[in-house]
Amino acid sequence: MSAIVIATKNGKCLPVLAASITMYLPDFFTVYLSGSGLILPKHRTITSDNTAVNFGDSYNNVVHQAIEDGHQDLLVCNDDIVFTPYTWQTLAEDLKRIPTEDRGWVATRSDYARGYQNIRFRHEGDRDGLRHASESAIVEVDVIAPICAWIESKNWVDFPPLNWYSDDIQCIDMQKKGLKHYISRAYVHHVGSQTTGHKPMELTQASIPWIRENRPELAELWFKSN
């Protein structure tokens, strides 16, 4: 059983995301949508209220719902992405190529993400036509952003109750369990920052107290000057 898991607050990008799911993703997916009553026309859709006040808890809650309903494969999606005709096909192909015993997150690339996940990243090597040659490779990384990312429910680890740094900490916790994270060749368009806005300093400062109290070793590593 496979589920697409989405949490939203303002839902302003949902109609386009929903249209791309309807057009391009197989109907064996059940869509879990927290924060909106939108029902997709071709996919079984389960909606719920999103009462959480941060990204981490918003997704923890809706992921728990999907897991409790017996879904083993989860495609966790931000509410402001758009699938292409080839996203799922490419991601499914890559899942078959990655060793399963220690597979954690398998994330798509996008045009609004950090590091290697971003197709704008300046990769080594020559361009291959209209792409970077490295876009044709599956890349193992320490941290991914689950903008659109696949995970097995048995490997799920809760996000901390944060907006920023929630994905960093979750990925580190999963690595401690022996799991590895990968960037797929698959791609989604990502609008970006539709809920929290473009406020990096403010969002960082809001996360520091929790990290200092609960993950002091990471606070020492990340915020020495704060």
Language-model features, listed with the residues they occupy:
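Short beta-strand-to-loop acidic/aromatic patch adjacent to the donor-nucleotide binding site
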Residues: 72-82
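C-terminal catalytic/acceptor-binding lobe
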Residues: 161-226
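Glycine-rich, basic loop-to-helix element that forms the pyrophosphate-binding segment
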Residues: 49-66
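Short, acidic, metal-binding catalytic loop of nucleotide-sugar glycosyltransferases
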Residues: 19-28
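N-proximal low-complexity "stem/linker" segments adjacent to membrane-targeting elements
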Residues: 1-20
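Short beta-strand-to-loop element that shapes/binds the nucleotide-sugar donor at the catalytic cleft/hinge
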Residues: 104-121
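A recurrent flexible, glycine/aromatic-enriched loop bordering the glycosyltransferase active site
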Residues: 129-151, 163
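Conserved donor-nucleotide/metal-binding helix-loop-beta segment in metal-dependent transferases, i.e.
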Residues: 86-105
